[in-house]
């Protein structure tokens, strides 16, 4: 399987994110409110050109945001000292194929080109299975913080991967 990453396909990005968001809702695992997954909400000065689509043999398969400044979730982290991952979504037809490991390899490589040696992410602190998934990929829990976004309140578990 040939994997490529593109940061110039916003329509593919939104399509995958909404598709995965709908599946999460249908299986009672809602992560995001579907009506918040819009270009107006997701594409801004911090995410522009940082919203990636992973293609598996030219088929759109996953999304993620890799940004270098994040005033909402990481206001206390100096710009360009960590890569911040958001909105990871892997299409169901690609589940179980270890695509997240490839996403992390790509993110590590992008970080290293900037002399950055840390990736941070945050997720819903109540999702123990998801937290274990991130820990299996090397992320260590760091702290929890309440966040407000798109009219919702979340208790976020922050995690870091250092390399």
Language model regions located:
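Conserved glycine-rich acetyl-CoA-binding loop
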Residues: 91-105, 114, 125-132, 136
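Acetyl-CoA-dependent GNAT
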Residues: 18-93, 101-106, 110, 162-163
